């Protein structure tokens, strides 16, 4: 997973200053599977990399397609970020899964956060 979202927020709050978002090398862009432009999202349900224009076209087709969760691709390292799109333009950031264990005398509680979509 990419740390791009947090770094992007820091960059935007820094008057739009230009800095590297990821420490990994810049890879070749992934192409949109419909038009060949640079892909910006990956739809797991369709198993397709799509540019923003094609993503809007494909996922506005019907109510089932609007439910698809699409992962945003980092512009620097080309990996999938935690930032997702649902529906037309609804942004969601997936939380990191962390396990917190609290051990008491005779029991332990395990808490794992999750997201309903």
Swiss-Prot record:
One BP term from GO: regulation of flower development
Tissue expression pattern: Highly expressed in shoot apical meristems and in vascular tissues of leaves. Also detected in petioles.
Subcellular location, record wording: Nucleus
ZnF (B box-type) ranges: 27-73
Induction profile: Circadian-regulation. Peak of expression toward the end of the dark period in both long day and short day photoperiods.
Cystines in this chain: none
Motif PFVFL boundaries: 113-117
Binding site for Zn(2+): 32, 35, 54, 59
Effect of residue 59 to A: In miP1a*; loss of interaction with CO, but no effect on interaction with TPL
Effect of residue 35 to A: In miP1a*; loss of interaction with CO, but no effect on interaction with TPL
GO CC, any one term: nucleus
Organism superkingdom: Eukaryota
Key word Hydrolase present: no
Function of the molecule: Developmental regulator acting by forming heterodimeric complexes, that sequester CO and CO-like (COL) proteins into non-functional complexes. Engages CO and the transcriptional repressor TPL in a tripartite complex. Involved in the CO-mediated long-day flowering-promotion pathway.
Name of this chain's protein: B-box domain protein 30
Gene that specifies this protein: MIP1A
